C-alpha cells in the first residue's frame, strides 16, 4: 500500500500501521481516511500530503 508524507512536518502515514490513536485501523488506505482526518503531528488536512515515491 502507498505511504503518504505530510509536506509541512514530515509525518509519514503508513496504511499498514494506520493511526490507531485517532481511530484509524491498520490496513486503512490513505484514500479511505475520513475527510475530517488531520495529520496527528501538525494538524493539517489531507490536502497537504503527497505520495512517498
From Swiss-Prot:
MF-aspect GO terms: electron transfer activity; iron ion binding
Residue stretches in coiled coil: none
Positions contributing to Fe cation binding = 6, 9, 39, 42
Cofactor(s) required for function per UniProt: Fe(3+)
Record has Ribonucleoprotein as a keyword: no
What does the record note about the cofactor? Binds 1 Fe(3+) ion per subunit.
Q: Which residues cross the membrane?
A: none
InterPro entries (alphabetical): Rubredoxin (IPR024922), Rubredoxin-like_dom (IPR024934), Rubredoxin_dom (IPR024935), Rubredoxin_ET (IPR050526), Rubredoxin_Fe_BS (IPR018527)
User: Where does the Rubredoxin-like domain start and stop, copy by copy?
Assistant: 1-53
Question: What top-level branch of life does the organism fall under?
Answer: Bacteria
Q: What does this protein do?
A: Functions as an electron acceptor for pyruvate ferredoxin oxidoreductase (PFOR).
User: Oligomeric state and partners?
Assistant: Monomer.
The protein depicted here goes by the name Rubredoxin 3
Which organism does this record belong to? Chlorobaculum tepidum (strain ATCC 49652 / DSM 12025 / NBRC 103806 / TLS)
